[in-house]
Amino acid sequence: ERVVKAAADTVKRKIARIVLLGDPDEIAAKNPDVDLTGVEIINPVKSPKLQEYADLLYELRKAKGMTPEQALETAKESTYFGTLMLKAGDVDGLVSGACHSTANTLRPGLQIIKMPKGVPLVSSFFLMIAPEGGNQYCKDGAFIFSDCGLEPNPDADKLAYIAVAAAKSAKTLADLDPR
């Protein structure tokens, strides 16, 4: 429910184009008070692009032993379908994790998008913007939190890498100047 409300609010504010994955009738029935105008809802199982995405997944994973039948079944899963949409260039980003475990969120990304060369580990971050614009800890009100939960026992080098990666992401995505 909170994901659907957030999607509707994002579209209403004209922040982004949103695509929800799931059964449109089920999503509407579970969220009768949410105006889904402008929110695209795609059912992976019934999508005309399912076979195209399954073929893409098969090509990427056949060396690991995946069969075309396994690729088709796997592509029906929302985390894989969304990641395949991203790989195919049909969407610009993917938000997952509210309804899926970290492992089930990351696995498709690592298998389909893959790690760039020279990137030694997966890390994450989030931004928090203080409502009044600032406080005693941060004059502009923007906070960057790096989540080391993906790397349970990082050494000093890994911690430094995580901090630099979060700072670069904040600069790229939000035009912040981390310090």
Regions found by a protein language model. Name each.
Residues 1-179:
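Anion-binding alpha/beta catalytic cores of soluble intermediary-metabolism enzymes, centered on
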